[in-house]
């Protein structure tokens, strides 16, 4: 037999209640001495050795729902099985209890004083009885495990059938709902079309009536306008004849006076305009020459910057083969150069706009100089474009060299 009284079988534990306290088997009898034979003590008639009393487990406390289930299972009806004479098995959903009587060991008690029982229960008989009981218990537990598995399979099959039924119901209901929704939409569309037709017809009738009224009012207005126009023409023709006589006399006097005033004003204004035109012309020419010099100076600076950039490019190509850390500083300098070039592009665009506005105001004498400046501007644009293309080529080469430099370091 097992020396430990706690035996736990995982094959039958559907509610995960953990180990249970099984029956305590009697310890092996001590070896009897030759002189005084020692008989095993009679087993006390206590009510039950419960298999299902839970040991003090170190696990965390169960949920309240599980404790309620345990209480309900304790109240559930139990089944009594008499395995052998003097050995009763009581089981329910949650626990198994065993009752051992005196009949199991077939002992005879003698109440006479000084006389010991002559019947001696051998140790091998007790062990064989207990082994038989354990085999019967294991068979019962295996049967219960089989029953539990079959019940679980039945429940799973029922759940599958219910799920299939629910899916079919859901599909049929969804189809019916879609059909009803489609029919309702069609009804609403038809009703909406009918109402639109009715409203359209009513609106068309109103438009026809209003058109007729408008034509009638228009004809009446034209007639009234013609009558008023005739009356006004008669009145104005009379007054006009009178006014023309008076105005002729007054006009002649006023025209003579105004003629003298206008001639004096015109002479003064013409002199002032000539002076202003000369001043503005001189200022425009000065500004034009100044801006031209600035543009030429900026163009020379751009050429110098391009030469410096080319030199820097050669230096960078030489340094990129040996150093990878200098790339960050060169990238920043390139970024600043790009910003400066973009600023210069914007300045060149602004200057072009100013040139166009000022050259439009200048006279035809300076058309040749304007053409020269436009040609210079075009050349500047081409150079700027070449600069941008050179920068793109330089960036591509720098990217290629930067991608090649880590490979060099890895090698």
UniProtKB/Swiss-Prot annotation:
Disulfide bonds: none annotated. Residues 124-220, 278-328, 355-385 form a coiled coil. The keyword Lipid biosynthesis does not apply. Residues 61-74 have a biased composition (Basic and acidic residues). GO terms for cellular component: cytoplasm; cytoplasmic vesicle; outer dense fiber; sperm flagellum. The modification N6-acetyllysine is found at residue 353. Residues 52-77 are annotated as: Disordered. It comes from the Eukaryota. This is Flagellum-associated coiled-coil domain-containing protein 1. It comes from Rattus norvegicus. The gene is Flacc1.
């Amino acid at each position: 037999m097992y020396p430990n009284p706690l035996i736990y079988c995982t094959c039958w534990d559907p509610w995960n209640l953990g180990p249970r306290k099984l029956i305590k088997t009697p310890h092996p009898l001590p070896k009897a001495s030759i002189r005084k034979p020692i008989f095993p003590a009679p087993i006390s008639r206590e009510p039950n050795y419960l298999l299902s009393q839970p040991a003090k487990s170190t696990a965390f406390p169960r949920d309240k729902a599980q404790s309620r289930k345990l209480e309900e299972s304790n109240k559930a009806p139990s089944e009594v099985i008499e395995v052998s004479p003097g050995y009763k098995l009581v089981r329910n959903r949650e626990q198994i209890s065993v009752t051992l009587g005196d009949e199991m060991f077939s002992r005879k008690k003698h109440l006479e004083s000084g006389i010991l029982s002559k019947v001696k229960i051998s140790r091998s008989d007790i062990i064989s009885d207990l082994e038989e009981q354990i085999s019967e218990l294991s068979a019962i537990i295996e049967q219960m495990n089989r029953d539990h598995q079959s019940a679980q399979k039945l429940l799973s099959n029922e759940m599958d059938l219910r799920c299939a039924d629910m899916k079919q119901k859901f599909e049929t209901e969804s189809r019916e709902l879609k059909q009803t929704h489609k029919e309702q939409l069609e009804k609403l569309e038809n009703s909406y079309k009918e109402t639109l037709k009715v409203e359209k017809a009513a609106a068309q009738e109103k438009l026809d009536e209003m058109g007729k009224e408008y034509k009638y009012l228009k004809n009446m207005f034209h007639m009234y306008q013609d009558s008023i126009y005739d009356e006004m023409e008669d009145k104005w023709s009379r007054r006009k004849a009178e006014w023309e006589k008076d105005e002729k006399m007054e006009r002649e006097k006023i025209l003579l006076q105004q003629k003298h005033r206008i001639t004096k004003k015109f002479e003064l204004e013409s002199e002032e305009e000539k002076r202003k035109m000369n001043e503005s012309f001189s200022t425009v020419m000065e500004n034009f020459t100044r801006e031209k010099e600035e543009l030429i100076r900026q163009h020379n600076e751009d050429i110098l910057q391009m030469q410096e950039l080319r030199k820097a490019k050669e230096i960078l190509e030489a340094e990129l083969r040996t150093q990878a850390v200098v790339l960050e500083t060169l990238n920043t300098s390139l970024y600043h150069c790009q910003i400066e070039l973009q600023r210069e592009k914007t300045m060149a665009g602004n200057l072009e706009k100013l040139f166009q506005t000022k050259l439009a105001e200048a006279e035809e004498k300076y058309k040749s100089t304007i053409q020269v400046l436009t040609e210079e501007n075009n050349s500047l644009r081409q150079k700027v474009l070449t600069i941008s293309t050179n920068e793109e080529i330089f960036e591509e080469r720098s990217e290629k060299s930067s991608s090649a430099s880590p490979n060099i370091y890895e090698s």
